[in-house]
Amino acid sequence: MEKILVTTDNSANSRSAISVAIKLARQRKSELIILHVYHLLRPFAWSDHAFSEYTDTFRKKTEEELGSFIEGIYEEIEESEINYQLELVSNIDVVHGVLDYAKKHNCSYICISTRGAGTMKKLFGTHTSKLISSSPIPVLCIPSSWQLTELNHMLYASDMTDHQNELKKVVEFAKPIGASVTMMHIAFPDEFLLDKDLAEATLQTEVDYKVEVLTPERDFTYTLMEEIENAIKLYNPSVLVLFTDRSRPMFEKLIFGSNAEAYSFYGQIPLLTFNKERKK
């Protein structure tokens, strides 16, 4: 059975991600795992026994608090069937804890809440951006302010370097929840483009799903992310899909950044990111 992993820090900021994950798990008939990663500092003077007892007490209290918190979310979104698995994992690094668990248990998607980040946060990174840049598993980022609505329209922004394979992954997410798919390629002025009707017919044959194709011309008065933001305002999708290249050299990442990571800082709609497969 497919597994959806959603993270929580037991704060109101994680409500949006948990709400979306609950709905997705029901729609996709997936197993829902809610994960809390924690790290306890051990005082030097404590014995092994004392620290073990403290850890047990902490875990029991946290499980009770999270159980009440999660059941409250089920009630808020009017999901009568409460069905999830709660996991607590100890790890000094939250991102490593999430990825280790997700890989070990073959999770299909990781769902996480995200907030806007200030300058210092951008400099040192956030859990969301670190997950996006390092996860081999697709990451669904839900803005903490997101009001729960159906994920029924996916806008896939493509650079057209591997769109056939990437589109299959997008459709694999969209099909079980009945979401429409639009593939958008922001084209350079001198770029050759296929006829829209022919491209849509070809893609429908390749992925066995209806795909709308948009090819707006690149406007160099805007950054690429600003153009994507403009497209979001124009076409009103419920999910933006981006593919991020984890194999890019570190210097290139520092200079140019990642569109997916950049969007996670200020995006107003859910963002689904996949690891871009590098052609050999």
Mark where each language-model region is:
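Small/aliphatic-rich secondary-structure junction motif
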Residues: 1-52, 153-218, 230, 237-239, ...
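Short beta-strand elements of ligand-binding domains
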Residues: 112-114, 138-144, 270-275
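Glycine-rich, Arg-bearing micro-motifs that act as flexible, cationic patches
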Residues: 112-130, 242-266, 280
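Charged docking surfaces used in two-component/phosphorelay signaling
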Residues: 86-97, 221-225
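A short helix-to-beta-strand connector/capping loop
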Residues: 75-85, 90, 207-215
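Active-site glycine-rich loop that binds ribose-phosphate moieties when present
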Residues: 123-126, 138-144, 148, 160-171
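A short acidic, glycine-rich active-site loop
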Residues: 52-65
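Glycine-rich phosphate-binding loop signature in dinucleotide/nucleotide-binding domains
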Residues: 101-108, 233-237
